Amino acid sequence: MSERKPPYLRSALDSIPPYRPGRKVVGPDGRSAKLSSNESPFGPLPSVRQAIADAAADLNRYPDPAAAELTAALARRFHVPEEHVALGAGSVGLLQQLLEATAEPGAEVVYAWRSFEAYPLLTGLAGATPIHVPLREETHDLEALAAAVTDRTRMVFVCNPNNPTGTAVRETELAEFLDTVPEHVLVVLDEAYREYVQDPRVPDGVQLYRDRPNVAVLRTFSKAYGLAALRVGFLIGHPQVVDAVRKTLVPFAVNHLAQAAAVASLAAEQELLERVAVTVKERERVRAALLADGWTVPETEANFVWLRLGEDTLDFAAACEQAGIAVRPFAGEGVRVSIGLPDDNDAFLTVARTYPKRN
């Protein structure tokens, strides 16, 4: 009997590592603080939970593939035409849709590094070539990013605020960068953490896109809105880009519960922003405590802080884990720590204070 041959699979997959999400740990005293995934520490508001419960009565029906109610609500909220709004299963889903619409073998996708770790994974899956541009002082080097654009570049990602460093580029420099990128190259402003931004110099991408047809903005309901489990994000861009993104959406990918919860969240936005203010206050408290204790922590406009630890990264993460605190290590580089509830933040600060080294 001849040896069975395995099914043919794309060779491009051989070099792509699996995405590793933040995990949960439990300490010896039973503490389990998950500060590894940049999730909101707050559950959905009562009105949002009620909307989910009401929508559950129709789970035997397919969701609206056009998500018309949510699309209209987003258009009203951001003062854009409905044909400028596209939806996806979280901003990661939209990133994949964008790559399917623009990338092909031989094409290049440019982004800062380190940045959102899904960028190289999704770029590789699309068969395109990822181009990493090193950060400068933990933030985007926009001049180097512009210089990396070639005639093979199809898309540029700008994560603002940047994940995992939390740093943000300012309006003047970002606008200048956008105006240097060739018109045929799509620039995607990934603003997953926009709601946490307090610095007025950090631009709202929705304002920058309006007179730039090659700029699109990504947002998500997973972070500040607290709907990470439901996977719903949106893109705001010009019709040619939006039409392409809509075509690459897997049918019914944005489920019925997600649509209902997102609409209800927009209606309760003021209450949600009050929760954001609590997280921002905790963010500033945590960073100030770390700085006072001798740590180097870049300014952050997101819901996390970044500690560049180099070769001590995994050791520090292990010390946190032993205390029942999950953080997100990037081996050889640093640790990202999400802002949680005050008690969990205090537990993390205790580990940081007792750790024998500083960065």
From Swiss-Prot:
SUPFAM superfamilies: PLP-dependent transferases (SSF53383)
Covalent S-S links between cysteines: none
The keyword Transferase is assigned to this record: yes
GO MF annotations in UniProt: aromatic-amino-acid transaminase activity; histidinol-phosphate transaminase activity; pyridoxal phosphate binding
Quaternary structure and partners: Homodimer.
NCBIfam families according to UniProt: hisC (TIGR01141), PRK03321.1 (NF002878)
This protein's name: Aromatic amino acid aminotransferase
